[in-house]
From Swiss-Prot:
Signal peptide: none
Protein name: Glutamyl-tRNA(Gln) amidotransferase subunit A
Gene from which this protein is expressed: gatA
GO terms for MF: ATP binding; glutaminyl-tRNA synthase (glutamine-hydrolyzing) activity
Species in which this protein is naturally found: Xanthobacter autotrophicus (strain ATCC BAA-1158 / Py2)
Record function comment: Allows the formation of correctly charged Gln-tRNA(Gln) through the transamidation of misacylated Glu-tRNA(Gln) in organisms which lack glutaminyl-tRNA synthetase. The reaction takes place in the presence of glutamine and ATP through an activated gamma-phospho-Glu-tRNA(Gln).
GO cellular component: glutamyl-tRNA(Gln) amidotransferase complex
Example GO biological process: translation
NCBIfam families in UniProt: gatA (TIGR00132)
Amino acid sequence: MTKLTQLTLTQAREGLAQGEFTSVELTEAYLKAMEQARPLNAYVLETPEIALEMAKESDRRIASGETGPLEGIPLGIKDMFATEGVRTTACAKILDNFIPQYESTVTSHLWRDGAVLLGKLNNDEFAMGSSNETSAFGPVVSPWRRDGDETPLVPGGSSGGSAAAVAAFLCAGATGTDTGGSIRQPAAFTGTVGIKPTYGRCSRWGIVAFASSLDQAGPFARTVNDAAVLLKSMAGYDPKDSTCVNRPVPDYEEAVGASIKGKKIGIPREYRMDGMSDEIDALWTEGARFLKDAGAEIVDISLPHTQYALPAYYIVAPAEASSNLARYDGVRFGERVPGRDVVEMYENTRAAGFGPEVRRRIMIGTYVLSAGYYDAYYLRAQKVRSLIKRDFDQVFAQGVDAVLTPATPSPAFGIGEKLKADPVEMYLNDVFTVTVNMAGLPGIAVPAGLSADGLPLGLQLIGRPFEEETLFSLAEVIEEAAGRFPVDKQWWRG
């Protein structure tokens, strides 16, 4: 029998339903794997007692025939999601030991459907980063290594703990958040599937805010079908989030395996950028061939404002972050550093409580929102954002069903390799992903191959608003044609 932790979420669901094993047995297997994988630093908090209690409840419900769609399935939760009575810090020192008295809407949906909480997963501080190196708990180490090289690699960010945990078989699936690529980029770096749904598809209530007009929750999974199962549970209308859209959630699982014959797939010429590696270019061409062989029509398209997306994003996102993070003052919750008066206390608390990357983004955001520069930077960036959205609207109006692009400009890089370099070099990791957030569209990253030195490479599919089903159908075609890419050597177990 396949090791319990190696089962896909879909296989685990079937095994539980058929009584082949219990949720307690499955949960214990994951808890043991988590214990052996602490060198990866994927979890910032393990919750074994809660997990086993939830698993026992699931087993009772399974025995009585009252099962939910995720009954008994052990999941990891990114530390950006508030979990009632369970420490939630956004991996920031300023929120050290914060224990929320409420549950995020997304996680409450997962518990409603029977899922089991294994623990809280590491991420970049306040989700600001592309490598999971800015966390107050230290960097996450990718379960992947280059062939013949023991250099520790980043799992991507900001949802690096989620990606690493799913890839290393430390949970059956995980939640992530995506503001500029924080689900899709780590998914591509770790050989996992990650989807950022349409803005408004999942509630943001109870998720620590980074950039409110860009943030969106989504799942990580080992297969396209598993991601579809998770998104169905996570999504849904929530009156507590004014940006959450009141429309029915489709059965995404039904879309997996559906025919893509006649679907029109756009290849944007602007994404062929200077310095893009030959292997990424070849992977992109092969991905288009996979879709064409399955009956899709491949067409060249133009998204002319793509070149302005990254600079516009790095104005809009820090501006919103500086506003959202103004609430962390040391008075109401979290870390507090004393001062002679209230102003000095604020200054000391924020200087000590925020890491360098978060401080950088707050300063950029405050600068671009200042009276003298608002029109020159922030207002202009918002105009560019409108033009990016218009580019996609025009392409979709021409009958294009989805857009195929690379997910990242390179495979994973070494820990420390880019963190100390020019920050712009790190920001360039998001070059293929930020347009999706700026336009509020759904995007999925799916593993499509391995680099010359044996690291995962992913492709990205971008869809029309609220047409995630199309993305699942197309991603499954790539998954079937390219194969899956599990981590083959579990070096962290010694």
